[in-house]
Amino acid sequence: MTSTQSRTGRLEIRSIDYVPLSERHGKVWHLGPLWFMSNAQIATLAVGLISISEGASLFWSVLAIVVGVLVGTLFMAFHSAQGPQLGLPQMIQSRPQFGYIGALLVWLFAYVQYAGFNVFNTILGGEAMSTTAHGPVKLWVVILTVVALVVALIGYDLIHKAEQWLTYLMIVIFGIFTITLFFIHYPAGTFDIGTFKASAFLGQFGVVAGYQISWAIYVSDYSRYMPPDVTVRKTFYWTYWGSAIGGGWMMIVGAVLAAWAGKNFDGTGIGELNQVGDHVFTGFGAIVLILATLGLVSVTALNMYGGSLTLISAVDSFRKVRPTLGLRVVTVGFTALLSLVGALAATKNFLGNFNNFLLLVLYLFIPWTAVNLVDYYIVRRGHYAIAEIFNPHGMYGRWGWRGILAYLIGFAAMIPFFDVGTLYEGPAARALGGADISFFVGLPVAGVLYYVFTRSVDVAAETRVAEAEAAELEEAAQRHQ
């Protein structure tokens, strides 16, 4: 193997460029710990707090979480399978659908997500560390950002290795914590089924599904170095169950903690984690918080890493760039700085802002995931001319009207069904009593339209181009060491 990053500790060089076969490495099972631990952190726990904090029963909240996780994780897992087959990071794969310039539409939204999540992540991490190790929250925000920056700069191999070790620790420590939940006293009526409220159920479902779908823009970034002979099925399963188990576990624990705290709920779950943990022994709550914060640091590094790839893709759309280590350092650093400024300037209403942000992510990426997956699995069936993706005048064009139009129409169809708390309630959502079913509208509209629009695409001709350019692509990629 002649990998540009053959062992943990060396700075990764590659970014948006194709990973040649000579540099492919890793086992498909590595995806399980990575996506388990990416979800097993405090921000995920906060997703499960939302409907409980609005008065829903624990039973219906947990059911909404389970359904939302099982549905939302499907999409991100299907995206993950693209990485080993194409050898490309996730968002650059949007060019065949949206065009060389047109893909900027979704890259802008993706970058907002990366930076936005890091604002929430570092605030939560800062509050958790301030609770356990004391000191100003903002100081801890800076420290956690710097640690995540170092991990992101070293890159792919360190991220995988760190997530594996953290997974082992999390299963043990959080397993003990979860068992403790069965032995604490809950308010009367906590486990009653309660009245089903469609708006609360769909609201929790939508936020959970949106959170899981939001990983779709990451997943190929962390599978693209794997050999192409790992099967799509295995890539899907390791990604799906790693993410679903980690995410579902944390969200359900969040809902249980909110139900246990009742009116004394602190708004983030940090205080409840600490208090319940101390039922094991004094100080165990601090151990749980520190470990959960390390999970936040790891996912913050993922956001910096993905944000860097998205920035480089955007720059490449206007001016052809040669991916280098220096370019990675600058773009990772800029992404870290941007989210740090946002975290230091953020307001106090964490849970309300986080809920609205998750809904925004869901709205923006439902049409994209439909377009991208229909293109990969149904239209082009995984056959792409990789070199043409980096050709500003190539066969995929500068503006992919099919993808752009399907996306915009799909998004527009969702607007009447939006329900974003006090910010906006669409007429259809209002007629449904506040139930937000935009997920079930945007996905089929965008997907079906894109399929119809692409009926005229000559996929056979594109495949011939891909086969003709394959050898040259490998040689060019190997020269970039």
Residue ranges and their predicted role:
Residues M1-L58, F201-G206, R224-K234, V457-Q481:
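Membrane-interface "cap" regions at the ends of multi-pass membrane proteins
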Residues G26-L45, T178-I184, I193-A259, T282-M304, ...:
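Hydrophobic, membrane-embedded alpha-helices of multi-pass small-molecule transporters
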Residues Q41-T44, V67-F75, A110, Y114-V119, ...:
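Selective recognition of specific alpha-helical transmembrane segments in multi-pass small-molecule
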Residues I52-L63, A128-V141, D157-L166, Q275-V276, ...:
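Transmembrane helix-loop boundary segments of multi-pass membrane transporters
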Residues M91, R95, I123-W140, P227, ...:
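Helix-loop-helix connectors at the membrane interface of multi-pass transporters/channels
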Residues G126, L139-L181, I193-F196, Y237-G242, ...:
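Membrane-interface loop-to-helix entry segments
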Residues A314-K348, M395-M414:
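Loop-to-transmembrane helix boundary motifs in multi-pass membrane proteins
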Residues W368-L449:
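C-terminal membrane-solvent junction of multi-pass transporters and transport-like membrane proteins
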